Amino acid sequence: MVKNTLISVISEEEKRGSVEFQVFRFTNKIRRLTSHLELHKKDYLSQRGLRKILGKRQRLLAYLAKKNRVRYKELIGLLSIRETKTR
């Protein structure tokens, strides 16, 4: 499973403040909230929280893409995230 391999890599490095780890945690929260919202369609507070987390992850991914394009490509490949649109 992708999640376990990424956790083992990040745990070995013990860099919990790294951009990759933060994006990984936000992605897990997003997936958990998405499955919650499929059951509870009118939970507007959770929808707001999901939008906030999506924005935070998008900003972190933009930062990573600007600083290190190779690490960005690897991360979106591992987490199965679509590449962000450029304006």
Swiss-Prot record:
<keyword id="KW-0687">Ribonucleoprotein</keyword>
<dbReference type="GO" id="GO:0003735">
    <property type="term" value="F:structural constituent of ribosome"/>
</dbReference>
<keyword id="KW-0934">Plastid</keyword>
<dbReference type="GO" id="GO:0006412">
    <property type="term" value="P:translation"/>
</dbReference>
<keyword id="KW-0689">Ribosomal protein</keyword>
<dbReference type="InterPro" id="IPR009068">
    <property type="entry name" value="uS15_NS1_RNA-bd_sf"/>
</dbReference>
<dbReference type="GO" id="GO:1990904">
    <property type="term" value="C:ribonucleoprotein complex"/>
</dbReference>
<protein>
    <recommendedName>
        <fullName>Small ribosomal subunit protein uS15c</fullName>
    </recommendedName>
</protein>
<comment type="similarity">
    <text>Belongs to the universal ribosomal protein uS15 family.</text>
</comment>
<dbReference type="InterPro" id="IPR000589">
    <property type="entry name" value="Ribosomal_uS15"/>
</dbReference>
<dbReference type="Pfam" id="PF00312">
    <property type="entry name" value="Ribosomal_S15"/>
</dbReference>
<comment type="subunit">
    <text>Part of the 30S ribosomal subunit.</text>
</comment>
<dbReference type="GO" id="GO:0005840">
    <property type="term" value="C:ribosome"/>
</dbReference>
<dbReference type="InterPro" id="IPR005290">
    <property type="entry name" value="Ribosomal_uS15_bac-type"/>
</dbReference>
<dbReference type="GO" id="GO:0009507">
    <property type="term" value="C:chloroplast"/>
</dbReference>
<keyword id="KW-0150">Chloroplast</keyword>
